[in-house]
Amino acid sequence: MAKKSMIARDVKRKKLVERYATKRKKLLDEFNSAKDPMERLEIHRKIQALPRNSAPSRMRNRCWATGKPRGVYRDFGLCRNQLRERAHKGELPGVVKSSW
């Protein structure tokens, strides 16, 4: 189980990303379409003025069952240990153990 403070930090980051998503997208579109270097510099400063944790690249995928940050399968939102455990119990529909 991950530390509760780390899970809370990621939840906080997720909220910030959602809150600033439209503003960040608008600024990035302006930045990419701007031709004048001084205009690009000004837009870049505006992007940098946004909260650091509002960038989507700072979010971390975590297992929803345990909060572990590594070995998380995107399709299920579970870490590898939980995925194996729940698949063996038959709690994941459509998942079968491989055999050849």
UniProtKB/Swiss-Prot annotation:
SUPFAM superfamilies on file: Glucocorticoid receptor-like (DNA-binding domain)
InterPro entries documented for this protein: Ribosomal_uS14, Ribosomal_uS14_bac/plastid, Ribosomal_uS14_CS
Biological processes annotated in GO: translation
GO cellular component: cytoplasm; small ribosomal subunit
Keywords attached to this entry: Ribonucleoprotein, Ribosomal protein, RNA-binding, rRNA-binding
Pfam families xref list: Ribosomal_S14
Gene3D superfamilies the UniProt entry points to: 1.10.287.1480
Sections of the chain in a coiled coil: none
GO molecular function, one term: structural constituent of ribosome
Described function: Binds 16S rRNA, required for the assembly of 30S particles and may also be responsible for determining the conformation of the 16S rRNA at the A site.
Subunit and interaction comment: Part of the 30S ribosomal subunit. Contacts proteins S3 and S10.
Family membership: Belongs to the universal ribosomal protein uS14 family.
HAMAP family, alphabetized: Ribosomal_uS14_1
Name of the featured protein: Small ribosomal subunit protein uS14
The species this protein was found in: Prochlorococcus marinus (strain MIT 9211)
